[in-house]
């Protein structure tokens, strides 16, 4: 059968249209996940904080607000959030406020009405509040999950009983912090308290938390251990700083129990530790050294640094061969660290001076990771990279193309495009900065979009 000229033209036109549509479909924008940001806006009922949410575009990294968000965080001053059970549930830690209504809670004037609020994550990213749970200690401020997602842990700055401190950590211990542990129900998202099987209270009853040395600053799961960064000098108000040593618990992946495996902390030779992060088999301690004290009592500005460690038996730390790594000298107050998904680059978020209008020295330091002949970190050309003022966190999107920081001082989210070869963080092809309704405190990424 032979086609007439008109028929041939019509067929070629249809084929061309099909090719065009096929090409267009290859570049069609779609969401690769959701970004959630907690914030301290108190316009919600009872002075609660909020959770904002954005869809992440796979082509540009641009963000679009999720319908029906922000929502109330379920309590005042949310500071941490964790996604679990296949990203079907979001857990938000609300610090609460003290008796005077201030967020500047201290050991003497502790936070009240602290809680963990659980949200169900809908297929379109919408959050629906479920239940509320409570820690066993006072002034909770950090929350993490184990690598399996079966257990959730909260670090309380102050344990409720000094007597239990001595029973767990040795005679003469008069004060301590604690870790409250929960089992996560993978079906309902509910939390069930884990009772301490190693230590009982002074009256012989079961202890409902795991004591850690006084003045905790941060904690992390690392190679089968839970390791707490604590300070020798009391840091009584949030955000807690001044970490000087680490203390390990052995972690059971079967029942979530934490077992003390040594009765003393390991000194790190620092005085201003701000955070501890375990990533890609290395434990990093971030150290903010604002001044060094000279032998004659004068002070010299000192550079912040990153301390990389391998984790050995019983949680003992051994410095990596390359030793301590300097932070970018133009930045200050490192508070979080991200190893990108391929293990080639490290990015350190520097909060700077967390005071609006101050010379913040905020930004992101970037490093190459060299594993051979020895573990080394070297600066990426062009760093430091921009962020908003006083970034609180840094996350990588599910496609490993973009990173986002959530910023306290200018109430924004800042997005950057990751160069997969050079490691540089570049402006997004669209808008790089997105406004929030108030100061940001933490961020998490959800890769589940249906």
State where each predicted segment sits:
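Predominantly soluble domains enriched in secretory-pathway, periplasmic, or organellar proteins
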Residues: 25-450
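Bacterial N-terminal signal peptides
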Residues: 12-22
């Amino acid at each position: 059968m032979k086609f007439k000229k008109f028929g041939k033209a019509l067929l070629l036109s249809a084929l061309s249209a099909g090719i065009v549509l096929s090409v267009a479909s290859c570049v069609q924008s779609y969401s690769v996940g959701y970004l959630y940001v907690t914030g301290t806006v108190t316009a919600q009922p009872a002075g609660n904080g909020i959770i904002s949410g954005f869809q992440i575009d796979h082509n540009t990294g641009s963000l679009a607000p999720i319908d029906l968000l922000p929502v109330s965080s379920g309590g005042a001053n949310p500071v941490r959030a964790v996604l679990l059970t296949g990203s079907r549930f979001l857990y938000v830690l609300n610090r609460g406020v003290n008796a005077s209504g201030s967020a500047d809670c201290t050991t003497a004037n502790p936070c009240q009405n602290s809680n963990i609020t659980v949200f169900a994550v809908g297929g379109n990213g919408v959050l629906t509040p479920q239940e509320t749970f409570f820690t066993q200690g006072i002034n909770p401020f950090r929350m993490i999950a184990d690598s399996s997602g079966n257990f959730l842990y909260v670090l309380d700055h102050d344990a409720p009983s000094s007597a239990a401190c001595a029973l767990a950590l040795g005679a003469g211990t008069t004060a301590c912090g604690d870790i409250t542990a929960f089992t996560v129900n993978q079906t309902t998202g509910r939390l069930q308290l884990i009772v301490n099987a190693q230590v009982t209270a002074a009256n012989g009853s079961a202890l409902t938390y795991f004591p850690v040395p006084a003045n905790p600053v941060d904690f992390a799961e690392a190679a089968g251990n839970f390791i707490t960064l604590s300070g020798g000098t009391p840091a009584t108000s949030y955000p807690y700083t001044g970490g000087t040593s680490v203390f390990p618990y052995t972690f059971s992946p079967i029942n979530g129990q934490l077992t003390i495996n040594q009765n003393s902390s390991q000194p790190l030779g620092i005085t201003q530790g701000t955070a501890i992060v375990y990533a890609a088999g290395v434990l990093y301690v971030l150290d903010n050294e604002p001044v060094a004290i000279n032998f004659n009592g004068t002070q010299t500005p000192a550079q912040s640094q990153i301390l990389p460690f391998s984790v050995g038996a019983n949680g003992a730390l051994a410095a990596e061969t390359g030793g301590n790594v300097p932070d970018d000298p133009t930045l200050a107050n490192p508070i979080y660290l991200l190893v990108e998904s391929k293990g080639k680059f490290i990015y350190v978020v520097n909060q700077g001076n967390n005071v609006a209008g101050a010379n913040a020295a905020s930004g992101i330091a970037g490093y190459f990771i060299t594993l051979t002949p020895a573990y080394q970190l070297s600066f990426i050309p062009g760093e430091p990279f921009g962020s908003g003022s006083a970034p609180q966190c840094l996350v990588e999107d599910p496609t490993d193309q973009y990173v986002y920081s959530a910023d306290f001082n200018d109430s924004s989210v800042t997005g950057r495009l990751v160069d997969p070869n050079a490691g540089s963080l570049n402006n997004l092809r669209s808008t790089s900065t997105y406004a929030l309704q108030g100061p940001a405190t933490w961020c998490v990424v959800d890769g589940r979009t249906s």
